[in-house]
Structure formats: structure tokens, C-alpha cells
Amino acid sequence: MTNDTLGLYGPEDSRYLNLVAHRAEAKGIKTAWVDGPTPGCVAYVADTDAGWPMWDLTPEEDVDNIQHPGLSCCAAVVLLCMRYIYSLPRDRRVCIIGRGHAVQWMYRVMRCYSYEVDQCSSTALDMAYLVSRADIIVNSADAVTEEVLGAVPASATVIDISGSMEPLSDRVADYVPRDHVGRWNIAELLRRVRVRIEEEGETDG
């Protein structure tokens, strides 16, 4: 059996997984809704917000690094955005809000790139202070307070993974909305899946 299908794990009304399925179809990548390990699946993607328990994935199947160390697709595209699209200098101070899958390994990699980085949980009491001194804010918190929004410098670049800083869209120097990050995230996911399919094809050959 050829392993050339991306397994979708989560509620079938998941907006994220349905977007993945739609964009995968446009790129000629097969998808299937699954509830466990499935013959023919080369990789799996899950709606991590759904909180469904998962079986153990191999590193090869886990293209989004849900269970394994490494950059998630979202974290990878945010780094690409900072380095190449916006050409943000490395001497800028970055504040990462949240510690979940969306920003997985981002702190570690940014430190390797010589950024000054602060990271806090989405409920940190000192969040307003941390954002007030940041040049770049990467936000993955589901909600932020008015105090935090008010502390964001007008000169800042905000990369808004979750969308909870949307009120700042016309109040900061640069604002990257949730939809943009989401499109890049899915593009990176499908790129990784395509690599896995090609690797499987070489093995079968």
C-alpha cells in the first residue's frame, strides 16, 4: 500500500482541519479523517485546540511536531516572517506570549539567532511590562487585557497568531493578522507532508 495520505484527527467541523483538507486538495495531496493509526497515512495533523487524546506518532508521521521536539509549523513560519519577509534586525527585543504548540521551540531558536527574547504564559502578571519593552510581539494568547493592549508600543511589530490583539491593527507600526499566519502555517504543513510523501516514494522505489 502506498503511504500518500495526510490523516486529519479531530472534530469534522474543525475549521482548521477543513482548511487543511481544502488546501491539500488544491495541491493534489490526499486527506482522510481518522480516529487512530490508519494504513496509507504518511503523516497526521491534529486540531490541538480540541484536546483529543492521541496515540503515539513516529517522528516521521508527526510533521507538525505535536509530540516531538522541534519547531511547530506555526513557529517556523513566524520565524521566516521575522527574518525574511519583514527583515527584522536581530538586535530587536522579542516578547512571546504563550507557551503552547503554536510557539513551540520559538524561544530557543530565537536565542540562537541572537534576538533578545522574553516569553511569558498567557496569564502572566507581568505581561504588560514585558510587551512595553518589546520591539516585536508574537501573541498566541486567546485573550489579553486592556492593560496589556495599552502597554504595546506604537513602534512595535505584532504577529498575532491567536487574533486577540486585533484591536491594535491600526495602532502599531506593523500588524500581521491571524489569517495571514494561518495561511502560512498550512502552507508549511503541506510542504512538510509533500516531503514525507516523496521520501516514502523513494523508499518504495
Describe the role of every protein-language-model region:
Residues T2-G40, W52-D56, L190-I197:
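Non-catalytic beta/alpha edge segments that cap or flank active sites
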Residues D4-R23, T31, G70-E147:
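Glycine-rich phosphate/diphosphate-binding loop of Rossmann-like nucleotide-binding domains
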Residues D35-S72:
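Phosphate/diphosphate ligand-binding glycine-rich loop within oxidoreductases
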Residues P39-G40, S132-R133, A154:
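Alpha-helix C-terminal capping/helix-to-coil transition sites in glycosyltransferase folds
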Residues A43, I137-V138, I159:
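N-terminal Rossmann-like NAD(P) cofactor-binding module of classical short-chain dehydrogenase/reductase
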Residues D47-T48, S140-A143, S162-G163:
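Short glycine-/small-residue-rich Rossmann-like dinucleotide-binding loops
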Residues A143-T157:
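Rossmann-fold NAD(P) dinucleotide-binding segment
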